[in-house]
Amino acid sequence: FFIHGNRDFLCGQDFAKKSNLKILPDPFFMNFFDLKIALSHGDDFCTNDLKYIEFKKEVRSKKWQDEFLGKSLDDRLKIASNMRDVSQASNNDKDISIMDVTSKTIDQFFEEHRIDLLIHGHTHRPKTHHTDTGTRVVLGDWHKTGWCLMLDEQQQELKEFTL
C-alpha cells in the first residue's frame, strides 16, 4: 500500500502497477479490531506552514504536473534538486512549531471522523501522543532505519528497525 508524500506525489498508477502497490487516498480509513484508524501522510495537519500549503497546491495541480512532466529528464532532475535545496533552506529558517501539526486541526480531524487512532508521518518526529480526542502516532523518516506501528488487540508499539 502507498500514500503519497511531499516528494513522491508524481507516482501514479503506472508506478503502482509495476511495483504491485495500491495507492491509498489520503486520508485512508480502516477498522482494525475495535479501533477506527486513519492513515495519512500528515502534511495536511501542518496548517501553520502557509508556504508549504501554497507549494503543495501548486505542485499538485494538473497544469504544473503536465508542464513538469513535459520537460526532459535532465531538466526534471535539476528542478527537483533545486526544489529540495530551496525546501531545506526554507525549513532551516522556519520555527519548528510552524512545521509541526496544529493541535486544533488534529482535534477537529478526530472529532469530524470519529476515529480512535491517527497514524501519520511528514513531521518525522516519532512519538505516540495520547489526548482527550484519541491517540496519534507519528512515524519517523526513512534513512538508515525505518519506522512502523506494531498493533494487535492488546497493544500499540512504535518501532524503529534497520533497513
Feature names for model-found ranges:
Residues 1-32, 144:
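Core catalytic region of metal-dependent phosphoesterases/phosphodiesterases
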Residues 13, 65, 71, 88, ...:
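Residue-identity detector for glutamine
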Residues 18-26, 36-38, 43, 49-54, ...:
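Conserved beta-sheet core of the metallophosphoesterase superfamily
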Residues 31-36, 67-74, 149-152:
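Short C-terminal domain-edge/linker segments immediately following a structured domain
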Residues 40-101:
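Active-site-proximal loop/helix segment associated with metal-binding centers of metalloenzymes
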